[in-house]
């Protein structure tokens, strides 16, 4: 079996996920994991699939037809099997909340990068602050630290950024 990661985007409409799932199934594939979202009228998704080695070429050739048939643009990249991609590490959950402003994601991710951390998952959104206080930016992330990175160093780097940005930041073990 070969593992592929698919990225898909298209104008939102009924049947997009069904069309992609059918293409995977028609080639003997298995839908392993996915993250799907609707953002600004666009459907976007990332999907991990496993395919029989001998069916991979036909599957890859079939993907452009999804664009013609349902307006779904799909890219495929060979991945690693589940569980093979991560070495020894620790994982932290990050939650950030503060007044929305440009550069927040850049600042936080730069601090994480400086500590050698990897972002395994990130979800962010904006919402109106209570009593007309403008827009709030909120983010949740799962952060992976390499074996040689100290959690205290990551925490210190993020707390420094949080103070500069004037945001609330929580960092704890997932659970």
Predicted regions mapped to residue ranges:
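A conserved regulatory-domain signal marking ACT and ACT-like small-molecule sensing domains
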Residues: 1-175
């Amino acid at each position: 079996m070969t593992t592929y990661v698919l990225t898909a985007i298209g104008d939102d409409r009924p049947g997009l996920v069904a069309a992609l799932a059918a293409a995977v199934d028609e080639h003997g594939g298995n839908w392993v994991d996915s993250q799907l979202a609707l953002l600004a009228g666009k459907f976007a998704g990332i999907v991990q699939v496993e395919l029989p080695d001998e069916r991979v070429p036909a599957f890859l050739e079939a993907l452009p037809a999804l664009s013609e048939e349902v307006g779904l643009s799909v890219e495929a990249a060979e991945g690693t099997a589940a569980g093979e991609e991560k070495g020894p590490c620790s994982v932290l959950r990050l939650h950030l909340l503060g007044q929305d402003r440009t550069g927040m994601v850049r600042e936080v991710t730069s601090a994480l990068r400086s500590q050698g951390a990897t972002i395994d998952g990130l979800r962010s959104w904006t919402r109106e602050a209570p009593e007309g206080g403008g827009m709030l930016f909120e983010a949740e992330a799962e952060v992976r630290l390499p074996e040689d990175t100290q959690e205290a160093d990551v925490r210190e780097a993020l707390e420094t950024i949080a103070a500069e940005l004037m945001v609330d930041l929580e960092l704890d073990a997932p659970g």
